[in-house]
């Protein structure tokens, strides 16, 4: 026991150097400086915004898309929809009605302002805008008094030839309603189709195989504070065979003969003779004491010479003033898509519809669709919840909601107005 005690001080002296003094310990970590934060970027996580009213893509490019907001401008993605940037914020108007990209020059993008989906909380526009750098910057190209531009079509080989479908403000009669055409890239415009001051253009389509052939839907519509008056003798279907310079109204031969409302179109890219037209009828209910037609979808298989009523299903054109948009698959004239509150598909030329359940649909309250003419599997749909992209012909969807703002109501304080 005495030997063990004698070694204890020696062991203590040997162990002591193994414990470093406090002064020799590592210094405390320095506070992060500005250089540490430069690699970090803010990411928006909400709240989510309002509806989108227009959509477009670039032929053959699965990564680049554009969407137009009801009151939040134009947004662009270059990574397939994962990240989006607003590119229209510098402009004095943010309500977008139509988008189109020139097939012959992907840098040329057109935006028509003024939402054409009619209901109580919509904004009018201030003309048509053009971008020559892929939607990064914009120039006002006129048509400031057209109110709402529902559709833009561009000549497939000449980006300077453009037609714009102008609905008008729709709050009353005005002369700036109809189809406008430019051949100099928007420097000058000609009103090539004008029915009357009460009627504007609701849709416009160009034959994919022959740009001299176009169809236009015209809509007699007036918005009131208590509702709207849709329909009248001004509404109808028109055709041009000279590139939109002159137009002929298509009457009879199977088309409705009684007054009707909104007209919307769908052309089959793979069959230039196949034309679909959606017409807002009264579904047989009298209008202003007059009988009305009953039907939703008509079809021509001979370029508009004769027509047949194909479908009365309201999933084709229910709540016509707010929806009424369709598209035909570029590789199958019988495959058509119909956008309303629901999302419906036909594979038999419009005779029957399959309505996708909400979980399988792009969204709800659908407003616009763009299909890549070279790859029908690739589509983008704009709707009230945002936008949805598919690479699988609609079997699966990638859904996105953006932080675009929209004002629905304004009020004042009764005590301090």
Predicted regions located by residue number:
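Beta-propeller blade termini and top-face loops
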Residues: 25-417
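N-terminal secretory signal peptides that target proteins for export/translocation
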Residues: 1-5
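Bacterial N-terminal signal peptides
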Residues: 8-21
């Amino acid at each position: 026991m005495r030997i063990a005690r004698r070694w204890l001080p020696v062991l203590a002296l040997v162990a002591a150097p193994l414990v470093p003094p406090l002064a020799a310990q590592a210094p405390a970590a320095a506070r992060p400086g500005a250089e540490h934060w430069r690699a970090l970027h803010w990411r928006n996580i909400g709240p989510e915004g309002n509806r989108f009213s227009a959509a477009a893509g670039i032929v053959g490019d699965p990564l680049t898309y554009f969407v137009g907001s009801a009151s939040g401008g134009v947004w662009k993605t270059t990574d397939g929809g994962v990240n989006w940037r607003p590119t229209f914020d510098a402009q004095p108007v943010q309500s977008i009605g139509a988008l189109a990209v020139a097939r012959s020059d992907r840098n040329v993008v057109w935006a028509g302002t003024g939402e054409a989906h009619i209901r109580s909380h919509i904004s009018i526009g201030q003309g048509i805008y053009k971008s020559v750098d892929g939607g990064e910057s914009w120039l006002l190209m006129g048509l400031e008094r057209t109110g709402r531009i529902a559709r833009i079509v561009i000549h497939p080989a000449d980006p300077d030839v453009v037609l714009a479908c102008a609905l008008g403000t729709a709050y009353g009669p005005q002369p700036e309603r109809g189809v406008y055409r430019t051949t100099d890239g928007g420097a000058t415009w000609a009103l090539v189709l004008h029915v009357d001051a009460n009627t504007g253009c609701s849709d416009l389509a160009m034959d994919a195989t022959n740009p001299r052939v176009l169809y236009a839907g015209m809509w007699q519509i007036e918005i009131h504070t208590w509702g709207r008056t849709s329909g009248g003798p001004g509404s109808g279907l028109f055709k041009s065979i000279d590139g939109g310079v002159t137009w002929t109204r298509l009457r009879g031969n199977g088309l409705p003969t009684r007054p009707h409302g909104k007209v919307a179109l769908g052309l089959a890219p793979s069959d230039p003779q196949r034309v679909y037209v959606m017409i807002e009828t009264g579904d047989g209910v009298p209008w202003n004491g007059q009988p009305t037609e009953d039907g939703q979808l008509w079809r021509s298989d001979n370029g508009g010479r004769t027509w047949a009523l194909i479908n009365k299903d309201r999933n084709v054109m229910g709540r016509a003033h707010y929806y009424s948009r369709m598209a035909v698959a570029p590789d199958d004239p019988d495959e058509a898509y119909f956008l309303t509150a629901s999302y419906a598909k036909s594979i038999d030329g419009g005779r029957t519809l399959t309505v996708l359940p909400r979980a399988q649909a792009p969204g709800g309250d659908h407003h616009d669709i763009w299909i890549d003419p070279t790859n029908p599997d690739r589509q983008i749909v704009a709707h009230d919840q945002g936008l949805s992209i598919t690479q699988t012909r609609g079997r699966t969807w990638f859904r996105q909601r953006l932080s675009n703002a929209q004002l629905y109501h304004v009020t004042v304080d009764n005590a301090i107005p």
